[in-house]
């Protein structure tokens, strides 16, 4: 698809809509030519097994934000502000920028991911507050070699999500993550070999604060810039959260790595038993995006 008419479709949504519902035996690959596509994109649950592959410079953008009015004069809300919604399982995206262009206006989501078994490779997620919403409690998501930027709680939600070799960039003081992991869930957010950087004006950043009491976030072998505060972790102003969250690090390095000064309710892991990427994402069906890439397809009976 291309904006200049050289493809089969002019918009990404037109291409998505053309995919047969529940096409279970094969993946559908959509090539997005270079360009900025301003549209509120929805990938519904029936459009399974889709791969979106972008040329360099393929940008999907919109300018919604929580306090913006919808057609009925109501506030969009955080969930309604997203530029892109992904509900279809076994979705794959590569080399695409997902952007919310509304600026520093409060909650403004770039990508809302509700589907299970979602894989992003070499993608960018641009925004300020609440950039990436890992929405569903049943969702597993894998981010590889991605760039994610924001200010406050810019990676947040209920899902189990792995971030492998990602670049996480803070634009202002705030919080990198705000997980809302369910009680009893084995994994929340796990970051492997990621690099955390910041704009010069961002000097007071926490790794996480718990949106819900049983939040989980683990940083493994990550390089932390000096913008990360020595205490590292925040309890969202609720002392009782310190008894229920699971916040941990393993072999953090860089100017922001300060294990001796970390919050007392956080942990320094002694080993990685149970924290292999394949274990974190396996679920009951053995999903392994590292080995299988985007070849897996949904089986619908």
Question: What are these model-predicted stretches?
Answer:
Residues 1-301:
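Sequence-level preference for short, compositionally simple segments enriched
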């Amino acid at each position: 698809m291309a904006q200049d008419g050289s493809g089969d479709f002019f918009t990404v949504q037109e291409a998505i809509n053309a995919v047969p519902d529940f096409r279970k035996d094969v993946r559908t690959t959509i090539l997005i030519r270079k360009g900025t596509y301003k549209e509120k994109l929805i990938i519904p649950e029936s459009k399974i097994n889709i791969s979106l592959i972008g040329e360099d410079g393929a940008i999907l953008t919109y300018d919604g934000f929580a306090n913006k009015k919808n057609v009925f004069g109501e506030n969009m809300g955080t969930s309604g502000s997203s530029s892109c919604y992904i509900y279809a399982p076994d979705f794959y995206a590569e080399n695409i920028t997902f952007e919310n262009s509304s600026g520093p206006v409060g909650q403004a989501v770039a990508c809302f991911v509700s589907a299970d078994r979602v894989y992003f490779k070499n993608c960018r997620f641009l925004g300020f507050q609440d950039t990436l919403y890992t929405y569903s409690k049943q969702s597993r998501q894998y981010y590889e070699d991605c760039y994610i930027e924001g200010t406050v709680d810019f990676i947040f939600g209920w899902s189990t999500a792995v971030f492998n070799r990602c670049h996480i960039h803070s634009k202002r003081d705030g919080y990198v993550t705000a997980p809302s992991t369910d009680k009893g869930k084995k994994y929340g957010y796990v970051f492997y070999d990621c690099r955390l950087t910041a704009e010069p004006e961002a000097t007071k950043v926490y790794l996480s604060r718990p949106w819900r009491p049983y939040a989980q976030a683990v940083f493994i072998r990550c390089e932390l810039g000096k913008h990360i505060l020595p205490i590292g972790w925040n309890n969202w102003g609720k002392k009782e959260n310190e008894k229920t969250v699971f916040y941990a690090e393993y072999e953090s390095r860089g100017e922001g790595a300060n294990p001796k000064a970390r919050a007392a309710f956080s942990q320094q892991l002694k080993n990685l038993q149970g924290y292999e990427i394949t274990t974190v994402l396996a679920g009951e069906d053995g999903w392994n995006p590292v080995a299988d890439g985007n070849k897996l397809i949904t089986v619908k009976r």
